[in-house]
């Protein structure tokens, strides 16, 4: 990833597997070169695996090892300017469920995001929203109760009103992009896993790259996965 010449790097969570101190320490070391290159333009939010146990949340392990991430301030919602016309709004809907992998999109969280949209719209023409959990799935990837965002319909309703140009997320460890019928103006992008191994390129370690045009369109969406030799393999996604 250090080879990429991106303006901004967005990471939508699941830095760890079970939110152990040793895992956070290892990941923080791995992210150090990325922070050296991108600084505050490397934007990280936690996933459910980073809030996996009540003990890790109480100890604030995520905040300890990623103090530059937005949740280090104690907030669950943030916004950051990416250019004169574009900003990103991120939110943290992860909490420890122990035997389940749900997120929780509460009314309070929805109200905070609503307020952040209203504020950001005064300053920027185009907004990208980033959370950890999807609210829409491809037909071949079923949504399961024990793994879904509780309140995903409420998130979809919020997005249908504010029409961000994209919703970036993760959680399901497979790369995809789609437009949901409820939110046709918003492109949902799942960057997939950054560190897994699979014979399926969309489930293998990689990321997604895209540009935002002056008119706010998502342009040049590219899937990237790593070859056996660790070299990036690129595939342009047809958005038509």
Spell out what each predicted region is.
Residues 144-215:
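Conserved beta-sheet core of the metallophosphoesterase superfamily
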Residues 25-115, 154-160, 182-188, 206-210:
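Extended active-site neighborhood of metal-dependent phosphoesterases/phosphodiesterases
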Residues 212-240:
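A short C-terminal boundary segment appended to hydrolase-like catalytic domains
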Residues 101-104, 120-165, 172:
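Active-site-proximal segments of metal-dependent phosphoesterases and phosphodiesterases across multiple
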Residues 5-6, 39, 122-126, 164, ...:
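A general structural motif
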Residues 17-20, 44-56, 96-100, 133-139, ...:
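Active-site environment of divalent metal-dependent phosphoester hydrolases
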Residues 8-14, 41-48, 92, 128-131, ...:
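Active-site neighborhood of phospho(di)ester-bond hydrolases with catalytic His/Asp-centered motifs
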Residues 1-25, 240:
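N-terminal active-site segment of His-dependent metallophosphoesterases
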């Amino acid at each position: 990833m250090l080879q990429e010449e991106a303006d901004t790097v967005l990471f939508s969570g699941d830095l760890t597997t079970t939110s152990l101190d040793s895992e956070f320490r290892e990941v923080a070391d791995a992210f150090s070169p990325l922070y050296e290159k991108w600084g505050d333009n490397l934007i990280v939010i936690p996933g459910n695996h980073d809030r996996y146990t009540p003990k890790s949340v109480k100890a604030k392990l995520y905040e300890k090892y990623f103090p530059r991430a937005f949740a280090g301030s104690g907030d669950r919602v943030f916004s950051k300017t990416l250019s004169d016309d574009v900003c990103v709004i991120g939110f943290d809907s992860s909490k420890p469920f122990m035997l389940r992998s749900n997120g929780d999109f509460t009314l309070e969280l929805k109200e905070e995001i609503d307020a952040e949209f209203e504020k950001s719209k005064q300053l920027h023409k185009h907004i990208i929203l980033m959370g950890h959990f999807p609210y829409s799935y491809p037909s071949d990837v079923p949504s399961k109760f024990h793994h879904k965002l509780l309140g995903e319909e409420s998130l979809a309703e919020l997005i249908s009103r504010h029409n961000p140009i994209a919703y970036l997320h993760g959680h399901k460890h497979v790369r995809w992009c789609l437009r949901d019928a409820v939110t046709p103006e918003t492109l949902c992008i799942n960057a997939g896993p950054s560190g897994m191994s699979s014979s399926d390129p969309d489930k293998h370690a990689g990321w997604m790259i895209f540009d935002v045009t002056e008119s706010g369109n998502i342009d040049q969406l590219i899937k990237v996965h790593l070859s056996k030799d660790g070299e990036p393999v690129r595939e342009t996604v047809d958005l038509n």
